[in-house]
């Protein structure tokens, strides 16, 4: 199994590199995901109205198995920082893991630097609001309610505490775009958010937010590998049906 796993990784890496090269000649077209359309609208309204976005990366530390959603959120954060640098209120980031908080501060600084607005950067906008699930949520709720937030982007590792964040967003009439990998969090998000990101759509955040060609190429590579797996399964079923070992 380890050899098969290594082969899959190498094939995926090769596909991604090849697609990055091909993307220079043609821009890929992805299906529309309503949550990302809503996010783009929220970004524009934030700049026009002089309000701020709230991005929450969850509480998946980098040394835990649940680190991937937070990294996906960081990839999107860089682009959001650049796009909202003209707003009167800089976006604010919350997280429930110390390493994620540090990375969010670094990502904010890099985003403002890329937008030639480094003077806007304030390390206090990358906040560690709590180290346990509900202390993390309790620290983020006052921010949603009291800091002129017009939209919330919740992309990371969440548990049942995500319901507190989406409830606070609803009470302040600030829309939320949310995604998580925990089944309980997914159920709560689906019930409480108008446009949830379902399943693997969470990991498409970087590609859909314009974070770079590598993110778009990786999304295309996932689609190709998915079709390869489907064809292998169908081929195996056909061989089994006709009694071919």
Residue ranges and their predicted role:
Residues 31-52:
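Membrane-cytosol interface motif
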Residues 150-200:
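Extracytoplasmic/lumenal ectodomains and periplasmic regions of secretory and membrane proteins
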């Amino acid at each position: 199994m380890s050899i098969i796993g290594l082969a899959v990784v190498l094939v995926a890496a090769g596909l991604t590199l090849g697609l990055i090269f091909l993307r220079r000649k043609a821009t890929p077209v992805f299906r529309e995901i309503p949550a990302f359309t809503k996010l783009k609208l929220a970004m524009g309204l934030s700049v026009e109205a002089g309000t701020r976005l709230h991005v929450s990366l969850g509480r998946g530390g980098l040394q835990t198995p649940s680190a991937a959603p937070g990294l996906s959120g960081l990839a999107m954060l860089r682009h959001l920082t650049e796009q909202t640098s003209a707003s009167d209120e800089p976006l604010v980031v919350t997280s429930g893991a110390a390493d994620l908080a540090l990375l969010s501060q670094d990502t904010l600084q890099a985003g403002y630097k890329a937008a030639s607005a480094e003077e806007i950067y304030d390390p206090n906008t990358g906040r560690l609001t709590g180290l346990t699930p509900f202390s993390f949520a309790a620290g983020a709720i006052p921010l949603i309610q009291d800091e002129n937030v017009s939209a919330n982007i919740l992309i990371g590792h969440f548990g049942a505490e995500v319901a507190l964040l989406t409830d606070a967003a609803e009470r302040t009439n600030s829309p939320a775009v949310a995604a998580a990998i925990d089944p309980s969090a997914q159920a709560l998000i689906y019930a409480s958010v108008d446009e949830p990101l379902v399943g693997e759509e969470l990991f498409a955040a970087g590609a859909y937010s314009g974070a770079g060609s590598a993110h778009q190429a990786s999304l295309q590579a996932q689609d190709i590998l998915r079709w390869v797996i489907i064809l292998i399964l169908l081929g195996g079923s056909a061989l089994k049906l006709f009694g071919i070992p």
